[in-house]
């Protein structure tokens, strides 16, 4: 979805200010750069600048993208170490009981699991 991170971060920033949160975390990562300009490091730098002038000066909110410089296989490996239940995650752009296996997101996910040397639990249902 074009501009999705602009939308997500804008809502998150508004809510964070209301509830006085100290940080917002977003899971954007390196492989998304090609199709989504709002996944690039330059976008996050610009959004952080905008946030500093767009919210109350007394309330500073950090915007953190800890996966930004990682690829899918690195994220999947990290998730495995952390016990992420990948069978409950969804990457496919289409609705259904099982991922389509054809969209870009499914291809990136399959490649990530393969490069990490792991089996995707969603594809083995």
Predicted segments, located by residue:
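Nucleotide-activated chemistry modules centered on ATP-dependent adenylation/adenylyltransferase
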Residues: 1-125
């Amino acid at each position: 979805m074009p501009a999705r991170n602009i939308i997500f971060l804008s809502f998150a920033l508004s809510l964070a200010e209301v509830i006085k949160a100290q940080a917002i975390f977003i899971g954007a990562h390196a492989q998304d750069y090609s199709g989504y300009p709002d996944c690039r490091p330059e976008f996050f730098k610009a959004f952080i600048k905008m946030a500093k002038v767009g919210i109350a000066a007394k309330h500073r909110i950090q915007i953190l993208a800890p996966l930004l410089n990682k690829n899918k296989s690195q994220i999947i490996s990290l998730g495995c170490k952390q016990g992420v239940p990948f069978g409950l995650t969804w990457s496919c752009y289409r609705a259904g009981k099982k991922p389509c296996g054809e969209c870009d997101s499914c291809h990136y996910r399959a490649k990530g699991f393969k490069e990490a040397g792991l089996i995707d639990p969603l594809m083995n249902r």
